[in-house]
């Protein structure tokens, strides 16, 4: 299943999460959660640098996914790029900081917590996580991929050095959307070349 580090403001359990104070904070009004954009409208973003938010995330992942039989988690959209205000406040384990300072670790924390939820639910279950973004260290918790690419020879040409470069940077398990994520269905030879 594809999970994201945020929730639309219109979702039924948004109010419950808001009361648990699990979201990053507005830079101009630190008592309020920050709002960014999601596919379906405005939403709030988890603050994985906050202990209470980490526990709430694991509880969510366990109850919604792991307890119903999944051990594979697709951690997506964890770049926090739709928060246009880079001074949004994060807890950073009580030290405080901004999303601009701590954005690189958010996807790593998200993947670690998702894996922890799987292992805490069943110590014999081995989690498998995929993540679209990450910094050094994420390879301990997730495979990454090059992001949403387009069905084209140009994307294939671009993704090859991206994957190789990630490997040289210590991320041994990097991939791409085979055949492309967006655009027309790939022609036969393009799909074969992606597979090679």
Question: What feature does the model see in each segment?
Answer:
Residues 1-196:
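Catalytic-domain carbohydrate-binding cleft regions of carbohydrate-active enzymes
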């Amino acid at each position: 299943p594809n999970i994201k580090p945020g929730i639309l403001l219109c979702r039924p359990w948004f109010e419950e999460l808001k009361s648990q104070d699990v979201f990053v904070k507005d830079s101009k009004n630190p008592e309020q959660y920050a709002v960014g954009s999601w596919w379906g409208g405005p939403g709030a973003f988890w603050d994985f640098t906050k202990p209470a938010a980490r526990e709430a995330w694991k509880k969510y992942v366990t109850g919604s996914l792991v307890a119903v039989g999944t051990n594979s988690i697709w951690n997506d959209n964890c770049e926090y790029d739709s928060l246009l205000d880079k001074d949004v406040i994060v807890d950073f384990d009580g030290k405080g900081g901004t999303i601009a300072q701590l954005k690189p670790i958010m996807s790593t924390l998200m993947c670690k917590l998702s894996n922890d939820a799987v292992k805490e639910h069943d110590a014999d279950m081995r989690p498998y996580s995929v993540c679209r973004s990450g910094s050094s260290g994420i390879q301990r918790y997730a495979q990454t991929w090059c992001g949403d690419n387009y069905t084209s020879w140009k994307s294939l040409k671009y993704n090859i050095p991206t994957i190789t470069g990630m490997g040289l940077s210590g991320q041994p398990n990097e991939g791409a959307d085979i055949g492309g994520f967006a655009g027309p269905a790939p022609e036969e030879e393009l799909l074969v070349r992606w597979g090679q």
